[in-house]
Amino acid sequence: VTDSLDDAGVEAVTAARVLDPARVLVAVDHDTPAGTVAVAEKQRKLLDFARDQGLPFRYGQGIGYHLALEGGLKPGSVAVCCGRHAAVLGAGGVLGLSLPPKELKTALETGTVSLPEAEVCRLRLAGALDRYVTAWDLALHLAPRCRGTLAVLGGGGLDFCQRAAVCGLLAASGAVTALFTEEPLDGAETVELAAVEPMAVLPGNFERIVPASRVDGLRVNQVFIGGCAGGTLEALRQTAAIWRGRRVNPYVRVLVAPATAAVYAQALEEGLVEVFMEAGALVMNQGCSACWAQSQGRCDGGEV
């Protein structure tokens, strides 16, 4: 349960009498610290809900999905929430489902959930991505064939950061959810990773996926490295390796936000944060940060 809920959602979910408090996590991770009085009131209601029923509660410690995985959520588990990025849990082999608030209330009270009826799209990844092709490109490459399905993927040797990017973007582009498995994928379609090219999404929605060559030369106003897929330790290490000894363009706002406090601490220990700051980036607190973009990191209507 997170502060991504709107006011009506908070009222619905906090009315639940929780069946098993140990299996629930309440995480204030989106607007931290609160940017308005209304947001502060919503977060207080979540705190009261957690305290009154003895629920685990985390404030400002990072993105709830990552906190759940750090807390020992095991492959093969089912996790439900109201957040739109629940599929990121699939990077750890967890079936993450996003529910409407009233259905989440029922799940909290009964410990059960009705699984969605969806075609299963099984994909076996083979080979390796080219040097300048990323997991984000892979997700956009797969998006058209995964829309409306439960995507189950295996192979490819992707690390956690890459799997999180694939699962999160597949769900954002229309899949019901997505997850990686170590189990055999009988009848799976094979996807050759070497055939994937750099991709981009044009403003508007994920229906507008194009080869990155279509936007070559596009002027960018703001860059955000963070969120469910970009705030992992692996992503921060990759960024620091590219930036070390370089400076960002002074006319481009560059924001970096680690996914969790544990990731932030490790990034500090490895000197990654120092690299970001010396490059001229703004290092944010852990959490959803500018991916949520409600109280920090917003662009104006004409910016990219």
Segments the model singles out, each with a brief description of its role:
Residues 1-304:
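Fe-S-dependent hydro-lyases/dehydratases of central metabolism
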